Design a protein with these regions (language model features):
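Short, basic/aromatic-rich helical patch in the C-terminal catalytic core of site-specific tyrosine
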Residues: 65-81, 145-146, 157
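Short acidic alpha-helical/loop segments enriched in Asp/Glu that coordinate divalent cations
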Residues: 47-56, 86-91
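Hydrophobic core segments within long, regular secondary-structure runs in both alpha-
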Residues: 2, 35, 142-146
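C-terminal/domain-terminus segments
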Residues: 37-42, 159-164
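Short, charged phosphate-coordinating catalytic segments
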Residues: 1-11, 157
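C-terminal catalytic core of Y-nucleophile DNA break-rejoin enzymes
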Residues: 19-40, 50-72
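Short, polar N-cap/turn motifs at the start of nucleic acid-interacting alpha helices
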Residues: 83-160
């Protein structure tokens, strides 16, 4: 819904939603181009006197929505990775955010965030065939999983969103 979108600045937007099981989600959209595109969707919705960004027909096209989620996931993964590379102290901050979110949701973090996620078998071959990495940073992947895609597992995020 349009009312669930909060502009932080010219290149940052927070989108609030309630997901499965009543989990309160916040998706962070970053980048001047992405924010400008979102403003276009909001403007169109307002002109159509619609509370929602997408029409019912658009929302029924899963490929389009999945593509948008995958692009947002990939952009955020790379931004988090870059952030941690530029300032190694940020890694501990991301880990703490992940732990706090698991605690807030009453879940137990079972993954070892210090161990890279390595694709194997068919998924490894598929990634290599399209020029994608076969090793992923688990902290960046889990951050994307929790705060962008609202999953609790890195394997789902990596296989269905980052390797696409």
């Amino acid at each position: 819904k349009v009312d669930n979108i909060k502009f932080i600045d010219c290149q940052t937007v927070h989108i609030f939603s309630i997901g499965k099981g009543g989990k309160h989600n916040r998706t962070v959209l970053k980048g001047i181009v992405a924010v400008a595109k979102l403003k276009e969707y909001i403007s169109r919705a307002e002109k159509m006197n619609n509370d929602f960004l997408l029409t019912k027909a658009e929302a029924r096209v899963p490929d389009g929505l999945h593509y948008c989620r995958a692009m947002c996931a990939q952009i955020t993964y790379n931004a988090v990775l870059q952030d941690m590379e530029n300032d190694p102290a940020k890694r501990a901050e991301y880990i703490q955010k992940i732990k706090d979110e698991f605690k807030r949701c009453g879940r137990k973090l079972k993954e070892n965030l210090d161990k890279p996620y390595r694709l194997r078998g068919y998924n490894r071959e598929a990634a290599l065939s399209i020029g994608k990495p076969v090793v992923y940073d688990r902290v960046a992947a889990m951050y994307v999983s929790l705060f962008i895609l609202h999953h609790f597992r890195t394997d789902t995020t990596i296989l269905h969103y980052l390797v696409k």
